[in-house]
Amino acid sequence: MDTDFPVSLSPAFLKVTRVRGQACPRVCAPNLPRSVTPSTSGRWATRAARSALHVVPAAGTAPAPPPPRALRPAPGPPRSAPLAPPLRRVVQSLGSSRGSRASCCSPSCLHGDSASQARGSEPSSSAERGWPSWSGLRGNSLAGRPEGWASGTPRLSKHPQRSLVPEFCIPEIPSNYLDKTEVVKAPKSRQNGRLLLCDPKEKLMSGSNKEKPQKSSFGRRPRLSSKLCTSPTQIPGGATVFSARKETSSKKIEDKVSLKSSENRPSSRSIETNRQFDLWSSSFLKESSGEVNKDLVLAKQEKNSEYCLEDIEENLSDSTDGDGEEDSNNEDDEGPAKKETRAPLELMAEFLRAEMGRDYQLAKKLCQMILIYEPENPVAKEFFSLIEEILLKEKAQEEEEEEESDEDSSSESEVDSSEDGSEDSSDECEDGS
């Protein structure tokens, strides 16, 4: 049983088809259960739209002849064919019925009494509509089934089921679309980089770590690396702290330099001793050239050595008076300080020259001065003992030479006296004869 739905036609359509305005057009849609929802896509939808529309004139009006290309004749009865052809026919009719329902879903589109008739003719349930059951449709499909098909449920379309209500697909907009389109702003609590403090006069720069570009839902959009550039006027606190630290560090450096300079400064006595050594070296050079006598040089050296010994004794007495109350730990600490005092290089050079020139008297005095600077120097002690032995040997040799010279002189005097006595006796003999 077919259900008729009244459709309102536009005036342009009436002009083209030459149908009177009193005609009540109706669209015939075939009966179909709710469970069968074949898809109307592709050329089948257009073919259904063309073949399903046909005008049924109302009673009391003369039918108008249709134009040659406006409408096509209604299709004939279904053939006894396999399951696929009736399903296609159903698809075509469904496409036409969907289009007609979409166009006349509201009651304002209907004309007068046709709207009330359509409302009154709508059944309240599927049983009143007179739609065939699923078993009936199954029997019709099995009657026209070919021989090769197996028994069972009818094959429906492979497309997913769709409802008869038109659906509108609205694309989903991601929630972070606006955030991605705008410039990425780093939060305040986040550290963009390390603050590099320079001189307070210069600008303070902070280089932020460049972030890697990340993929967004709409393509590649690299994040902007934020760089902060602030002048020293904007950060007075940091500049003051930096200047205070700089002042304290400069003061510490100045104190260290002053201490080092005071430690490295030679004392007045050491300067005097250096001058004395210079005089000795010059006198030694003059002596080697033959300009000055040895006696004068030795006298000057003895005087200078006496002054040096007096100064050293005074220093030792002062240190012993102060160190008498101190512990042994302080003495251990002072030990390396005493060891650090070394004899000047000029004194060592003069000593070596005297030793090579075999001037053992001068070498002995220079060795004594070296021992004054370095009393625990083993090399100086060995040289001093060797020089003393050499001097003793020289003294012994000189004494032996003097004795030999005395003996020679005495023997010579005795020989002279004997010669004189023999001459006197010979003279007396000659006189007696």
Curated annotation (Swiss-Prot):
Q: Where is this region: Disordered?
A: 56-86, 113-161, 189-273, 308-344, 394-433
Task: Please list the residue ranges that the record marks as compositionally biased, kind Acidic residues.
Answer: 308-334, 397-433
Q: Indicate, by first and last residue, each region the UniProt record lists as having compositional bias (Pro residues).
A: 63-85
- Cited InterPro entries: ERICH2
Q: Where is the composition biased (Basic and acidic residues)?
A: 199-214, 244-258
Q: What ranges does the record list as Polar residues composition bias?
A: 114-127, 259-273
PANTHER family linked: GLUTAMATE-RICH PROTEIN 2
Protein name listed in UniProt: Glutamate-rich protein 2
